[in-house]
Amino acid sequence: MPWEFLKKCDRQKAEVRGEKEEQEPVPGNPHFQVQFHVTSCRFAFLAFLAGSFLAFSLHALISSNLFWRLRQLHHLPTAHYLQTRDEFAVYSVDELNAFKEFYDKSTADSVGATYTEAEETNIKEALSSLRLAQDMYMAGKDDKAARLFEHALALAPRHPEVLLRYGEFLEHNQRNIVLADQYYFQALTINPSHSEALANRQRTADVVQTLDERRLASLDAKRAALSAIHEANSALRRAKKEAYFQHIYHSVGIEGNTMTLAQTRSILETRMAVDGKSIDEHNEILGMDLAMKYINASLVQKLEITIKDILELHRRVLGHVDPIEGGEFRRNQVYVGGHVPPGPGDLAVLMQRFEDWLNSEYSSSLHPVNYAALAHYKLVHIHPFIDGNGRTSRLLMNTLLMRAGYPPVIIPKQQRSKYYHFLKLANEGDIRPFVRFIADCTEKTLDLYLWATSDLPQQIPMLIQTETEAGEQLVKLQSPQMASIPESFYESGSGALP
């Protein structure tokens, strides 16, 4: 029998190797029961290991998601909240690398983004205008080229090619290297691998840094000149009083308050109501007055600013408008235009990081204007309150400036659109235009004080309001000296090469 012969051969081979032929287990046999028990134990042990591994993996995944959620909160690393934007403000050499690492949109998302039909139409028209603009520029028709570039930018404000070519036009034709550098930077935020934008940025970065440093040195010189004036100087005291009214008037005006400067002054001096104005508008002015007095009496002298100080500041800002919400973190999610602030559950962590940053050695090493502008942006970006975030942020900014010897900076309500535009640019990754805007406002405020305390025979600078054809209120300085300053000086981002 072939089959039996083969089995016999196998048994003989096993005996030669010294192996024992195992008897085939049969159900009911004790050997089968022992083997079944051992197999069950092995299965249970393997199941335990598999379950442990699954639980560990699930825990790691959840922890990782939580970590990355916090890490990517507002697209920035956990340990250094808004550190990337800080580096932009102080012009770190590594700003591009930091930007590429932490920017909120990946290269793939930016480059491979899909557009709606209307957006695609706008992009096609923008690129067509861009080609015409370049042709006009080559033909020497600079005015037409400038208008076509602006038209292309209006149609596609976030198209890398439009930003790049318009920046080159501004750099070489208009000699506005600061604005050109800003557009190169924006092009890189959308497409970090854009080689031409990167090459242009590397060429302009050092020049722009020099211009910005020169601007800050000019502010320091004007601050020193103002500090040299004795506090008992009557003109200085009158200027401070007038600036106090202006600061409150403009700060509430940015938020939509319709009170005029004269009405604001009347409310603060007489505490009498103004006919035809809402109670909330009155209370906003009174709240700012309380907050300013708190700063002068307490915060300016403090070595460190804490979360409690910021809450106390906000409590006074909303003290008359909404005393329940005043001094309290919001408990709901809010939306501010295209910006989505952090959820209420993240506010405590972010505000603690903000406090740590405010009082860190790194912050103390910044120029006071950079430091104050960054603090302003950080707080308004976190948006910790249900209302009054802008007013509280501007008050905090002025607290930091006053501690450094600067006067409270006035951000004119007429520049509200620029103010919000530069905040939007900061949200997109470049804080520098916002810092320059604050530097502009600081310089104008210093000029106002220096003019008021000069030996010129004219009266102190008063602000008058004139009505435009559209009924819009404008504020102008009654001053020959200020009138001699070119209009471009008042435009934010004035950094044209001399």
From Swiss-Prot:
It holds the Pfam family Fic. It comes from the Eukaryota. Keywords: ATP-binding, Hydrolase, Membrane, Nucleotide-binding, Nucleotidyltransferase, Repeat, TPR repeat, Transferase, Transmembrane, Transmembrane helix. GO terms for cellular component: plasma membrane. The active site is at 383. TPR repeats lie at residues 126-159, 160-194. Its main location: membrane. The record marks 255 as: Important for autoinhibition of adenylyltransferase activity. Gene3D superfamilies: Fido-like domain, Tetratricopeptide repeat domain. Residues 305-440 form the Fido domain. GO terms for molecular function: AMPylase activity; ATP binding; Hsp70 protein binding; protein adenylylhydrolase activity; protein homodimerization activity. GO terms for biological process: detection of light stimulus involved in visual perception; histamine transport; protein adenylylation; response to endoplasmic reticulum stress; visual behavior. The chain crosses the membrane at residues 43-63. The side chain of Glu-255 determines which of the two opposing activities (AMPylase or de-AMPylase) will take place. In response to endoplasmic reticulum stress, mediates de-AMPylase activity. Adenylyltransferase activity is inhibited by the inhibitory helix present at the N-terminus: Glu-255 binds ATP and competes with ATP-binding at Arg-394, thereby preventing adenylyltransferase activity. In unstressed cells, disengagement of Glu-255 promotes adenylyltransferase activity. ATP binds at residues 255, 336-339, 387-394, 419-420, 427. Its EC number is 2.7.7.108, 3.1.4.-. It is found in: Membrane. Protein that can both mediate the addition of adenosine 5'-monophosphate (AMP) to specific residues of target proteins (AMPylation), and the removal of the same modification from target proteins (de-AMPylation), depending on the context. The side chain of Glu-255 determines which of the two opposing activities (AMPylase or de-AMPylase) will take place. Acts as a key regulator of the unfolded protein response (UPR) by mediating AMPylation or de-AMPylation of Hsc70-3/BiP. Belongs to the fic family. This is Protein adenylyltransferase Fic. It comes from Drosophila willistoni (Fruit fly).
